[in-house]
Amino acid sequence: MSGDTCLCPASGAKPKLSGFKGGGLGNKYVQLNVGGSLYYTTVRALTRHDTMLKAMFSGRMEVLTDKEGWILIDRCGKHFGTILNYLRDDTITLPQNRQEIKELMAEAKYYLIQGLVNMCQSALQDKKDSYQPVCNIPIITSLKEEERLIESSTKPVVKLLYNRSNNKYSYTSNSDDHLLKNIELFDKLSLRFNGRVLFIKDVIGDEICCWSFYGQGRKLAEVCCTSIVYATEKKQTKVEFPEARIYEETLNVLLYETPRVPDNSLLEATSRSRSQASPSEDEETFELRDRVRRIHVKRYSTYDDRQLGHQSTHRD
């Protein structure tokens, strides 16, 4: 089990040097703090290969631990879960991004995991012949595909739905210009934040122009840019360009780049430590989880009075 919530050791806690006695403890779980990311794994997994980790957990190297028993490793924990998977299974699926492969290879070199280094080098060599665009904008083909993209994304999601053919009436004089401005702003935001946000386009939805914003798999906000107005005794469709509101909601989703509370796997892995904590600390933890959930609902409920079409489904 592993957890990727960034938690810092308690202030004032002084790490101590100790020798790790690994003999006969193959199935024992150890808790690791790798640059603030917390992991649970077995000594057996860490000592299967002849690496620096094997030296640390077979007693050949001294390790740092904090007062709660977490073993401290002064490295970035971003790719440590991938490294653990390689140590367990002897193989992994490498990231698609060249930069992430380079980062993983640097960590593998530090831990002296030569097999993983070779995998990364081979993948980088293969990618020299095929260039991948930096900014990819998927265009969804079905509601099911949209749901899968949003649920599986580790990044916040911004979706622009535009479908001019949905209009039943004539447009107001500025509507075409405003529709184009919405599309242009989407392209600009995609170029600016493509590394931090997943941008997707929807050209088959039921709206004419509508922005949706998602974080951690749930819908946070929606900005509908169309309305029906009456002019010269007939209905017309008006498309607006609420630029400031779109910028505001895009910046809001950046708050959801990393988990705000520990995930279930981490909470389960650290249940022993929590069971020793005071009741007040447990209450604070659950209050935090509940408060975050209510904020999500409250944030989204401000848009409930708008017609959302097939995007209105919201699961708490």
From Swiss-Prot:
Residues 28-96 form the BTB domain. PROSITE patterns: BTB (PS50097). It holds the Pfam family BTB_2. Pathway: Protein modification; protein ubiquitination. InterPro entries: BACURD1-3 (IPR045068), BTB/POZ_dom (IPR000210), SKP1/BTB/POZ_sf (IPR011333), T1-type_BTB (IPR003131). It is found in: Cytoplasm; Nucleus; Endosome. SUPFAM superfamilies: POZ domain. Induction: By TNF, IL1B/interleukin-1 beta and bacterial lipopolysaccharides (LPS). Residues 268-287 are annotated as: Disordered. One of its GO terms (molecular function) is small GTPase binding. Its main location: cytoplasm. The modification Phosphoserine is found at residues 278, 280. SMART domains: BTB. Phosphorylation at Ser-280 by CK2 facilitates the nucleus localization and increases interaction with PCNA. GO terms for cellular component: Cul3-RING ubiquitin ligase complex; cytoplasm; cytosol; endosome; nucleus. One of its GO terms (biological process) is apoptotic process. Substrate-specific adapter of a BCR (BTB-CUL3-RBX1) E3 ubiquitin-protein ligase complex involved in regulation of cytoskeleton structure. The BCR(TNFAIP1) E3 ubiquitin ligase complex mediates the ubiquitination of RHOA, leading to its degradation by the proteasome, thereby regulating the actin cytoskeleton and cell migration. Its interaction with RHOB may regulate apoptosis. May enhance the PCNA-dependent DNA polymerase delta activity. Belongs to the BACURD family. Component of the BCR(TNFAIP1) E3 ubiquitin ligase complex, at least composed of CUL3, TNFAIP1/BACURD2 and RBX1. Interacts with RHOA; with a preference for RhoA-GDP. Interacts with RHOB. Interacts with PCNA. Interacts with CSNK2B. This is BTB/POZ domain-containing adapter for CUL3-mediated RhoA degradation protein 2. It comes from Homo sapiens. The gene is TNFAIP1.
